[in-house]
Amino acid sequence: MRKHVLAASFSMLSLLVIMGDTDSKTDSSFIMDSDPRRCMRHHYVDSISHPLYKCSSKMVLLARCEGHCSQASRSEPLVSFSTVLKQPFRSSCHCCRPQTSKLKALRLRCSGGMRLTATYRYILSCHCEECNS
């Protein structure tokens, strides 16, 4: 009986290895998603304070978009039949930018009992999009 249980366990293990983990991605997006340099959201902590008033500063969790986009940047000359060439090149590039964000606010306590509200955008997701000139 012990040999049958061991054989069954070994067979299930072999089947899992052959089939792979069904919860993980198996398409090419998994390879791209696993690149640690890809465009993604990164968290960091920063101190928020008012530049003019004497307020107590607050430590806040912020997010930024950072990383590489898979599309290559390119510039190529434009051909013109005019003597004045206003825009001599056509450029194409992609930048890592916020895709979705939400407005957040925090209150700072200042001298004299005054309270000031600071607002900022908290980035929820990032993506690659064409850069503006």
Swiss-Prot record:
One GO cellular component, as annotated: extracellular space
The CTCK domain, residue ranges: 39-132
Effect noted on mutating K58N: In ND and EVR2
Annotated phenotype, changing R38C: In ND and EVR2
Annotated phenotype, changing L108P: In retinopathy of prematurity
One Pfam short name: Cys_knot
Signal peptide: 1-24
Subcellular location: Secreted
Chief location of this protein within or outside the cell: secreted
Its job: Activates the canonical Wnt signaling pathway through FZD4 and LRP5 coreceptor. Plays a central role in retinal vascularization by acting as a ligand for FZD4 that signals via stabilizing beta-catenin (CTNNB1) and activating LEF/TCF-mediated transcriptional programs. Acts in concert with TSPAN12 to activate FZD4 independently of the Wnt-dependent activation of FZD4, suggesting the existence of a Wnt-independent signaling that also promote accumulation the beta-catenin (CTNNB1). May be involved in a pathway that regulates neural cell differentiation and proliferation.
Record's protein name: Norrin
Species in which this protein is naturally found: Homo sapiens
Lineage of source species: Eukaryota, Metazoa, Chordata, Craniata, Vertebrata
